[in-house]
Amino acid sequence: MNQLLTFYPNRIIIIRKWCESAKSYFVGTYLKGICIMENNVIILAGGQGKRMKTNMPKALCNVIGEPMLEWVLTACENAELDDICVVKGYEGQQIEDYLARRKSKADICTVMQEERLGTGHAVMQAADFLKAHAEGNTLILYGDAPFIDAETIKGALELHTEKDCGVTVVTSRVENPTGYGRIIRTENGISGIVEHKDCTPMQLAITEINSGCYWFKTADLLEVLFDIKPENAQGEYYLTDCIELLIAKGKKADAFISANPHVALGANDRRGLLALNDIARYEIIGKWLDEGIEFCCTDGVSIGNNVTIGHGTKIHSGVILRGNTTIGENCNIGNNCIIENTTVGNGVNLNNVQAYESVIEDDVKIGPYVQLRPNSHIKKGAKIGDFVEIKNSTIGEYTAVAHLTYIGDSDVGSNVNFGCGVVTVNYNGDKKFRTVIEDNAFIGCNTNLVAPVRVGKGAYTAAGSTITTDIPDNALAIERGRETIKEGYAEKKLKARTEKFEAIHGKSEEK
């Protein structure tokens, strides 16, 4: 081969290109000849949850700072499902608004369920979605059952496709199955689901329960969906009736037992929602303990489902980590920090910090009592001290903002030093303007920088100055009134105050 490369390099290249072209041709031709199955999902999120006593859909009630619907959407996206249809109902516009704000990985559409007439009726509203994806499989699950996970979804789909099932029910084994539908198994799969109130004494002993999560062959589901009848006391259309109809048509039905013991859990009232929060909090902290993260005390600690934490990091009491937050390695997250949708680098030390939608680079020290408002970027090695607020600003490498300072709408260079009490005056009552402070500048105590203004490289501002014009590189700017001294002024003021006091209260007796 080496000789060929030496004497016929161009021919080798031609042969290689021909092989790559042939491979693309054969692979492309093969794919055109087969049907690629889509795996899509319908999420039922139309419930009101009257016992929650809230004016929002139940699926938007929070578990560890995230709507239950978000937990479900995240699981579906992590399972790499294709398209998602959310069935909305009560206060459906709130569902629309939430999805519009969300950065989704999958394509998401919504349909409206005007009347809440059961789970089967909810799925009927998504009939057009089902017909558009009739060649694949469809997962149906509740938007207010937050503990469904990607591993369960993928495991159930694998069983569903391997056994060529018309329907596969996701189930769980629990110690106390009270209130849940029981799974009736046969040698070839399952024969049905019996609701708790309809169970015989023998069926009540069954501990395998229905999670309310189902994989259907989409075409099979469409075949029976509109055959279900509201023949029950509630006058509702039950999706579970589709299982019996499919079995009656000779379709195979089976059940996948999830390793997740909480997969079926939901909440109907505030007590139930609090219980879900406690479970989620305990499970997530346990996961990070297993990853080697040190928790000095778990009191008040809350970590969101989408948070990641690097090795060697220490978490103290009262810490709340929410949203798409990433904490790097060997960090110290001190007491009472709230970090939301923020990226934190390695070796960062935070103490009583609130940070929202910001970036904190490596080896930064912040706190105590610091707020980073959205779009703040603190670069490597910077130090932000007590009682500082930063908003929509970049703080350069190794810059020090020691205390009692407001920096808003500013671009700050590296190795800048801020004295105590500096304010970037960014708002004139109508518009906001930016302040630029270049590398190695020194901003004296109680300086007001009235934007738009630029402080040049290496420039100084004298303490107490109000800066309204640009400062050249390496210059000193002093903008304050000259000090005036009035001799004897205090004695005159004291005499006047004494006379006024005596006129009101009388002359004091001399001792």
What are these regions (language model features)?
Residues 207-310:
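Conserved alpha/beta core of the MobA/IspD/sugar-nucleotide pyrophosphorylase nucleotidyltransferase superfamily
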Residues 294-478, 483-484:
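Structural signal for interior beta-strand "rungs" in well-ordered beta-sheet cores
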Residues 30-40, 66-141, 147-158, 162, ...:
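Conserved N-terminal catalytic core of the sugar/cofactor nucleotidyltransferase
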Residues 37-54:
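N-terminal nucleotide-binding beta1-loop-alpha1 segment
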Residues 55-71:
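Short catalytic helix/loop segments, enriched in acidic residues and glycine
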Residues 93, 148-233, 240:
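Conserved core of the sugar-phosphate nucleotidyltransferase
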Residues 6, 12-14, 20-29, 33-34:
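Short, positively charged and aromatic/hydrophobic N-terminal segments
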